[in-house]
Amino acid sequence: MTRKIIPSAFIDRVPNYSFNINKLVYEFKTYLEQFIEDVNDGRNKVLVQRKFHLYKHNTYQYNEVDTIPYTAEIIKQITDIFTFDSVNYRYIMPNTAYNWHVDTGANCLHIPLITNEGCWFVYQNRSISMPADGSLYTVNNGKPHTFVNAGTEPRLHLTFEILD
């Protein structure tokens, strides 16, 4: 039986979860990075985000799931516990910030894979950093927020989202 993602005031670490970031990054870089696409929603004049839907509405968007066994194991582990219907890789490009927005799903889960000290989620006078240390985070998307990558390298997160 699955449950809704744990509500968060802003961003919280989900206890008792730890993932091997090196394995996740290896599988992404080796098999999936080639599929990532630019996101241009018309609100930004520069490229801020690149994204790949790995899993959407209970279906993999990638046909060779056997090449990413560790990632597939994590998706199964999380879907056995939490309700969500989309898994994405999201690059946030260096020296960029997104617009203020509220997402459709109230909360989502993030596993930071590649980050730097210039990467921040920003809410009403509050900035929060999520290190790529193997942790799972719940992020409140129902409050106005943005994200910033003031570093020189792209930031990469694996995200689990509710689309409705």
Regions found by a protein language model. Give the residues of each.
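Non-heme Fe(II)/2-oxoglutarate
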Residues: 1-81
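A short glycine-rich, His/Asp/Glu-containing loop-to-beta-strand
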Residues: 75-94
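Short, conserved beta-strand element in jelly-roll/cupin
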Residues: 91-93, 102-119
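Histidine-centered metal-chelating micro-motifs
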Residues: 97, 118-119, 137, 142-148
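Short glycine/proline-enriched turns and hinge-like loops at secondary-structure junctions
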Residues: 102-104, 123-124, 149-152
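A short beta-strand-loop-beta hairpin characteristic of the jelly-roll/cupin
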Residues: 114-132
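Conserved SAM-binding loop
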Residues: 128, 133, 140-142, 147, ...
